[in-house]
Amino acid sequence: MSIPRLKSYLTMFAAVLMLGQVLTAQAEEALPDFTSLVEQASPAVVNISTKQKLPDRRIAAGQMPDLEGLPPMFREFFERNMPQQPRSPRGDRQREAQSLGSGFIISSDGYVLTNNHVVADADEIIVRLSDRSELQAKLVGTDPRTDVALLKVEGKNLPIVKLGDSEKLKVGEWVLAIGSPFGFDHSVTKGIVSAKGRTLPNDTYVPFIQTDVAINPGNSGGPLFNMKGEVVGINSQIFTRSGGFMGLSFAIPIDVAIDVSNQLKKDGKVSRGWLGVVIQEVNKDLAESFGLDKPAGALVAQVLENGPAAKGGLQVGDVILSMNGQPIVMSADLPHLVGGLKDGEKAKLEIIRNGKRQNLDISVGALPDDDADIGTGAEGSAERSSNRLGVSVADLTAEQKKSLELKGGVVIKEVQDGPAAMIGLRPGDVISHLNNQAIGSAKEFTEIAKELPKNRSVSMRVLRQGRASFITFKLAE
């Protein structure tokens, strides 16, 4: 090999080595260093333990069981044949249940945020600080709908966390959790933001932050930090099939939690806006049926009588596209936005009605403590049949209309083979709208059914056990 060629190979080899060193250095620079963040934030993170006294139903040796709930014949038999030992009065025997979670201090005078499920039904709450000192905590208030609880401990100049803005959090951003999984105090785990605005079953009013940060029992109520050392969420739930962490963790946005805590501190309870509607997702077929370019918004399936939406002119079949300038991409976006308003505040809605856009201004009400009872349907009279749909229907009675808050509609009497059977309709279902037209009677229903288009998505509003939803179907040639 000639010397020039050898020099060329050596030069190339050196260049490759230098490139590898540069890439390694860049990779090391790209990985965040959490040490200063943890040192700064840890002192304000606390361990929360609770105690709850529960009735102990177990029977001590030699003790007469409680026979109070037995029928007289059996009670007399046991009293005659069992040794006569003193019976402990009902409720005297107790056992103690304990739970463990995390929290963080948000004010130097001792206010602490955690999850409602960490302290629910507790008789005693102990907050343990980073220096291992323990303080008795008072429950200021809880909000089960968001799973937020506010505690108060007696103290001065306590370390506090910095609060961030969860709205500014971006998907892909690094985040870090500090908590007490399985009782291991001040354990640190990290990950990234996987998604924002997640809605979980039975948690309508929280747009959860989804992360892949390792969260386990005991982490609940602890803080989720961004890389600035600011709290952006409260770790609350995980999705799991095994009972342990599977890479899907959910945190309550700190903006939501602080709004709740401020109301709990001021009023001891939380008030939310309420429209008084039942909504559903807009899928591809419904979008076509209602004249939308693509699936988007929240479809109004039911408007509660005398509710804010009814008074403001919102109608069944309207599709809500935005509220106060915020787009409604999915139906689950609407409850978050409405819930953030106070009683009497305005909700500016952009809707589509009969294929045309328009705006409505509605004054929201206060969310009731319990869901309104919207009644159930029963069978009516004046039966008619639609061979095109394969269904027989009858008029609703006056009582049924009042119970369901309907001006008209029909109840299904019989379902034959055909489109109705294919989409799952069954006797007792109530149909209030067909092809975006309100139904006044069984006669109107059959007339509308005769004019339904073929090979195009057709919508039908159905109430089953009082709950309304839109479904779609297509009639073949």
Curated annotation (Swiss-Prot):
Which PANTHER family does the record cross-reference, listed alphabetically?
PERIPLASMIC SERINE ENDOPROTEASE DEGP-LIKE-RELATED, SERINE PROTEASE FAMILY S1C HTRA-RELATED
Instruction: Print the organism lineage.
Output: Bacteria, Pseudomonadati, Pseudomonadota, Gammaproteobacteria, Pseudomonadales
Which EC number(s) does the record attach to this protein? 3.4.21.107
Subcellular location, in the record's words? Periplasm
Indicate what this protein is called per its UniProt record.
Probable periplasmic serine endoprotease DegP-like
Naturally occurring in which organism (per UniProt): Pseudomonas putida (strain GB-1)
What the record says about family reads: Belongs to the peptidase S1C family.
Gene Ontology biological-process annotations: proteolysis
| Leader sequence residues | 1-27
What keywords appear on the UniProt entry? Hydrolase, Periplasm, Protease, Repeat, Serine protease, Signal, Stress response
